[in-house]
Curated annotation (Swiss-Prot):
UniProt key word Repeat: no
Keyword terms of this UniProt record: ATP-binding, Ligase, Nucleotide-binding, Protein biosynthesis
Catalysed reaction, written as an equation: L-glutamyl-tRNA(Gln) + L-glutamine + ATP + H2O = L-glutaminyl-tRNA(Gln) + L-glutamate + ADP + phosphate + H(+); L-aspartyl-tRNA(Asn) + L-glutamine + ATP + H2O = L-asparaginyl-tRNA(Asn) + L-glutamate + ADP + phosphate + 2 H(+)
Any Pfam family the entry gives: GatC
Keyword flag RNA-binding: no
Signal peptide coordinates: none
Native source species: Exiguobacterium sp. (strain ATCC BAA-1283 / AT1b)
Task of the protein: Allows the formation of correctly charged Asn-tRNA(Asn) or Gln-tRNA(Gln) through the transamidation of misacylated Asp-tRNA(Asn) or Glu-tRNA(Gln) in organisms which lack either or both of asparaginyl-tRNA or glutaminyl-tRNA synthetases. The reaction takes place in the presence of glutamine and ATP through an activated phospho-Asp-tRNA(Asn) or phospho-Glu-tRNA(Gln).
Example GO biological process: regulation of translational fidelity
Protein name: Aspartyl/glutamyl-tRNA(Asn/Gln) amidotransferase subunit C
GO molecular function: asparaginyl-tRNA synthase (glutamine-hydrolyzing) activity; ATP binding; glutaminyl-tRNA synthase (glutamine-hydrolyzing) activity
Length: 96
């Protein structure tokens, strides 16, 4: 039987930068345990002869040729950008 611990719920919440209460930790622990137990039922299925699949639907990417289209002049982009460095728009860091 799959069981997720409160420590694991707190860890995942921390990774997601979520502040959760003790009550929420208990609630999510119970919910996630039920979800894992439900998913374990798939182990009981006989999948002999069933081809592995990566997608539920047989979709294909539709590719097209690249085409050059008019865009803003570089000078206008530079004028509008809050920060510009070495010919590129400088943005705040996403990762620490």
């Amino acid at each position: 039987m799959a069981r997720i611990t409160e420590a694991e719920v707190r860890h995942v919440a921390g990774l997601a930068r979520l502040a959760i209460t003790d009550e929420e930790v208990t609630h999510f622990t119970e919910q996630l345990t039920k979800i894992l137990e439900f998913a374990e039922q798939l182990d009981e299925l006989d999948t002999t002869g069933v081809e592995p699949t990566t997608h539920a639907l047989d979709l294909k990417n539709v590719l097209r040729k690249d085409e050059v289209r008019p865009s803003l002049p570089r000078e206008e982009v530079e004028r509008m950008a809050p920060d510009w460095e070495n010919g590129q728009v400088r943005v705040p860091a996403v990762f620490e």
